[in-house]
């Protein structure tokens, strides 16, 4: 049985060893939260998402994933939290995304972006652009992201 933690910060910091992981961002909403980690900060980034919940005044780790997406908050509701995250271009300080026809902007930092929508139905957000040195630059298409990821894997394997 997980005894939980007094604070969300304690729960987040206990998820991975601090010497080998970097906390990129945390978003809290009532008794739920989600954090984005870089689990390989000294090399090619490896982002990882972890959900947290508070029950009986104690924070505990919930599900986790190496991909963004929608996560239900309660079996009694169709609403949940949607995340969209990934690598940001060098020098990017903002990200622009579109969800349900609406445009959203959020900070990009530490080479990553992290967008969070709470109390939403399952839908997909699309990243459209990054602000780099004051100028908005179109985000790569999904196929371009996949090619970049394949290149990163090849470099990591030395092939």
Can you say where each PLM-predicted feature lies in the sequence?
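Long, contiguous interaction/targeting segments characteristic
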Residues: 1-72
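A broad structural signal for short, well-ordered beta-strand segments within beta-sheet-rich domains
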Residues: 20-23, 61, 92-94, 122-124
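Well-ordered beta-strand positions
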Residues: 27, 87, 107-108
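Short beta-strand-to-loop capping motifs
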Residues: 37-39, 88, 118-119
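Ser/Thr-rich low-complexity repeats and stalk/linker segments
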Residues: 53-56, 78-83, 93-159
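Surface beta-strand/loop "capping" patches
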Residues: 67-90
């Amino acid at each position: 049985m997980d005894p939980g933690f007094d604070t969300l910060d304690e729960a987040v910091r206990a998820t991975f060893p601090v010497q080998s992981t970097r906390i990129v961002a945390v978003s809290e909403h009532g008794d739920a939260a989600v954090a984005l980690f870089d689990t390989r900060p000294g090399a090619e980034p490896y982002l990882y998402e972890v959900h947290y919940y508070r029950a009986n005044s104690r924070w505990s780790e919930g599900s986790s994933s190496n991909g963004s997406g929608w996560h239900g908050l309660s079996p009694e509701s169709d609403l949940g939290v949607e995340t969209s995250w990934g690598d940001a271009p060098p020098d990017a300080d903002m990200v622009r995304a579109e969800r349900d026809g609406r445009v959203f902007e959020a900070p990009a930092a530490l080479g990553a972006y992290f967008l969070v929508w709470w109390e939403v139905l399952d839908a997909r957000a699309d990243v459209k652009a990054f602000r780099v040195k004051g100028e908005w630059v179109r985000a790569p298409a999904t196929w371009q992201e996949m090619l970049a990821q394949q290149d990163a894997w090849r470099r990591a394997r030395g092939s």
